[in-house]
Regions:
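Conserved acidic, metal-coordinating active-site core of Asp-based
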Residues: 99, 103-224
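Short, acidic loop-to-helix structural element flanking the phosphoryl-transfer center
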Residues: 19-36, 85-92, 145, 198-212, ...
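Residue-level signal for inorganic ion chemistry
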Residues: 32, 43, 70, 160, ...
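Hydrophobic packing residues within well-ordered alpha-helices of enzyme cores
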Residues: 25, 50-54, 172, 176, ...
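Active-site phosphate-binding/coordination module
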Residues: 23-129
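Mg2+-dependent phosphoryl-transfer enzymes with acidic/Ser/Thr/Gly-rich catalytic loops
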Residues: 1-5, 16, 22, 195-277
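Short, structured coil segments at secondary-structure junctions
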Residues: 62, 70, 180-182, 236-237, ...
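Short active-site oxyanion
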Residues: 36-40, 62-64, 159, 219-220, ...
């Protein structure tokens, strides 16, 4: 198997549970890149929030790409230039805000620079990026209050999130009308984050787009992940790799189950299938 492209999720996959990056994973990725393999980090985060990882690994050269906002954006890591972008419009944002109000869940609109904060339901403030609010040195996007009745026109958003403790989200998700699932791509990216994206947006479609643009066949692509938002990343790769800590649904579609994120499962898979050592 001649792997030419590796697409790697971050949280729960490349990163340890304490969100650190191991020397083993860094070394494996660097060796793969030196061997001519295109390595792409895939995340729900904005590019600004992963620059330190790209720098540490060495993925900021000309030609390096990243999949951000769970597939809504493909960007050049060296310049931030947008290669492909899928967005939600003003009317769709209002529609999702009304859903949040009905479910008593807070809504945040997120673009390349801002986390917009329309009014939250009483007693249900958003916990999205709450840790970064406490430490302003870690804020990658700027929080900005917005009046839902006076949104700018045009108003294009990369993704919408509803962020509350997991048990609150789990209680409300079954109450989302089917019409919303038909119109949007809705899933939990983390225990406390529900994401709402354009219907055609996911990590797998972004991975496919890059593979086709670079002239790679499906069997030359490896995708690694652990959560619901990684399902297409794993299922649509020629070699789909699930972490040992992955949810059952991801393991079911995987071709191989590697070690856990805390055991450097990414390095293990790259060494086994790409570097052949």
């Amino acid at each position: 198997m001649d792997i030419k492209l590796i697409a790697i999720d971050l949280d729960g996959t490349l990163l340890h549970s304490d969100r650190t990056l191991s020397d083993e994973n860094i070394q494996a990725i660097r060796e793969a890149k030196e061997a001519g393999v295109q390595v792409i980090l895939c995340t729900g985060r904005p590019l600004l929030a992963m620059n330190y990882l790209l720098d540490e690994i060495g993925l900021r050269d000309e030609g390096d790409l990243a999949i951000t906002y769970n597939g809504g954006l493909i960007q050049k890591t060296q310049t931030g230039e947008v290669v492909r972008q899928m967005t939600l419009n003003r009317e769709e944002c209002i529609e999702v805000f009304e859903l949040g109000r009905d479910l008593h869940l807070p809504v945040n609109f997120i673009d390349l620079k801002h986390i917009y904060e329309p009014p939250y339901p009483e007693g249900a403030e958003s916990i999205y990026m709450s840790d970064r609010r406490k430490d302003t040195t870690k804020i990658d996007l700027q929080f900005k209050e917005v009046d839902i009745d006076n949104l700018p026109e045009p108003f294009f958003i990369n993704k919408i999130v509803m962020s509350r403790p997991g048990e609150e989200l789990d209680a409300m998700i079954p109450k989302i009308p089917a019409a919303y699932h038909d119109k949007f791509n809705i899933y939990k990216s983390q225990e406390f984050i529900l994401e709402i994206l354009p219907p055609s947006v996911d990590k797998g479609s972004a991975m496919r787009f890059i593979g086709e643009a670079l002239g790679f066949e499906k069997h030359q692509i490896m995708g690694l992940g652990d959560q619901e938002n990684d399902l297409t990343l794993v299922s649509e790769a020629g070699l789909g790799v699930a972490m040992d800590n992955a949810i059952p649904a991801v393991k079911e579609v995987a071709d191989y189950i590697t070690k856990s994120n805390n055991e450097n499962g990414v390095a293990h898979a790259i060494n086994k299938f790409v570097l052949k050592k």
